[in-house]
A protein has these predicted regions:
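Short, surface-exposed basic-aromatic patches at helix termini and helix-loop junctions that form
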Residues: 126-133, 155-157
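Bacterial N-terminal signal peptides
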Residues: 26-34
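Active-site regions of metal-assisted phosphoester/phosphodiester hydrolases
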Residues: 40-83, 156-217
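Bacterial N-terminal signal peptides that target proteins for export
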Residues: 16-27
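N-terminal, active-site-proximal structural segment of metallo-dependent hydrolase catalytic domains
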Residues: 37-129, 139-143, 149
Length: 217
C-alpha cells in the first residue's frame, strides 16, 4: 500500500482528498491502493509531491547471514526469492512510481519507504530500472529490528538536500526496543525553505495483543 501527498508551500489553499484506483503488478498479487491529498495553487511548481510506500519485505536474493528473514528471502530459502523475482519486483516498484509521475506531472520529490532490508536493495532499485533517469539519492541506516528491515527516504537532489539526518531509537519503560528506528531528516528545499520529514513503521502487535498493549499506548 502506498500513500501520496502534495505538500503546498502556501498555508491557505483548499485541500481535497480522493482515492485512486487499485494497481496490480504482473508478477506479484499486490493491491497498491493509493490515497492522495492534493492542493491546488497558482503553479504546479508551488508544491512538492511526497509519497510513502511499505514495500513489504524488500529483501535482495542473497543470504547475508543476518537472520531468519534474510535466509527466508534468498534463492535457497523457503520463499525461493531468486534474482529474477527480486529484479521483477524492482521493475514493478519503479513502474508504480513512474505512474505517479505521469498522473501528477512530476515525479515524487521525496519517498518514504518501509520494510527495506538495506541500502543495497535501494541502490539496485535505482540503478536497474527507469528510475536511474532521475536524480534520486538514498537516506538509510540499519536498525536493530529483529527481522532486519528498516525505513528509508528517496529524495530528488534537484529539489532538496538533507541538512541533518538522525535516527530515533524507540524506547519503552526506559528500555530501547529491538525494532525499526524512526528516521528524521531536515531538508533544505531548493526555494530556500526547510521542511522536516519523519518516517516510521513499527509492528502493531508484536508478541500478541496483550503483550504489546503497553508499548502501543
Amino acid at each position: 500500500m502506498f500513500y501520496c501527498w502534495n505538500i503546498l508551500q502556501s498555508d491557505n489553499k483548499r485541500i481535497e482528498n480522493y482515492m485512486k484506483p487499485n494497481l496490480r503488478s504482473i508478477f506479484f498479487i499486490w493491491m497498491l491502493v493509493a490515497f492522495s491529498v492534493e492542493g491546488y495553487c497558482g503553479s504546479r511548481e508551488e508544491y512538492m509531491l511526497i509519497m510513502f510506500w511499505n514495500l513489504e519485505n524488500f529483501f535482495d536474493y542473497t543470504d547475508g547471514g543476518e537472520g531468519e528473514s534474510d535466509r527466508e528471502f534468498s534463492s535457497s530459502g523457503s520463499r525461493h526469492w531468486t534474482k529474477k523475482r527480486f529484479y521483477a519486483k524492482c521493475d514493478a516498484v519503479a513502474k508504480s512510481i513512474m505512474w505517479m509521475g505521469d498522473h501528477y506531472g512530476r515525479m515524487p520529490d521525496l519517498i518514504g519507504l518501509a520494510e527495506i532490508e538495506n541500502k543495497g536493495v535501494l541502490y539496485k532499485l535505482l540503478k536497474s530500472t527507469a528510475l536511474r533517469k532521475y536524480d534520486y539519492d538514498i537516506i538509510h541506516y540499519d536498525s536493530g529490528d529483529r527481522r532486519g528491515i528498516d525505513v528509508a527516504f528517496l529524495y530528488r537532489k534537484s529539489v532538496m538536500h538533507p541538512e541533518t539526518v538522525s535516527v530515533i531509537k524507540p524506547e519503552y519503560d526506559g528500555q530501547k526496543l529491538s525494532t525499526r528506528d524512526i528516521l528524521h531528516s531536515s531538508m533544505q528545499i531548493s526555494d530556500g525553505s526547510r521542511i522536516d520529514f519523519i518516517v516510521n513503521h513499527h509492528p502493531s502487535k508484536f508478541g500478541g495483543e496483550d503483550e504489546s498493549k503497553g508499548r502501543r499506548n
